[in-house]
Amino acid sequence: MASSIGSLTNPTKLANTFHTVKHSNITSTTIQTYLSYLEDAFLLEKSMRYDIKGKRYIESPAKYYFVDLGLRNARLQFRQTEETHLMENLIYNELRLRGMSVDVGSVTRTERNEHGNSVRRQLEVDFVCNQGYKRWYIQSALALPTQEKVDQEVASLRSIGDSFRKIVITGGLSPTYQNEEGIFFLNILDFLKDENSLNL
């Protein structure tokens, strides 16, 4: 789990991997039990998938985040430092600290492929945050070096039809701004320093 923070996790697929790689007979039920023990010990938190357009929860897979990134890094002997995943986990922890419920968003978009056929694409919103009547859709992006990368990060946000705030939190010190589509871009330091940064 420590090496796959921010990744969709399915106990059945994990059990299959254990069976194939380790020749273990561990079941998905046992893995799910272990995951719930890690949650009960406040080592991991589970973030459920939420179908934004269908307004319902999707049972599996879910994402797990470490409550303490220091413990996660120590478990991996400080070797596996993927900044993108660490930043996503850090944002998750800060959102939870601010009292929000945090889910992983799923939105379907229909588009044309190279042959002109309609194809449905499943897009992910890193965080769907709720607090009372307020909601925010948040993407975590370590860097946005090209317009292509910007378009990739905001594709899921563009596919959401409601008027709740849509935000991309970036690494580095880029200035806060709002684009012509109403999507806010906010750097990680400004996000962490100001408890009201999502409401600017």
Model regions: which residues?
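Conserved helicase/translocase motor-coupling segment
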Residues: 1-40, 46
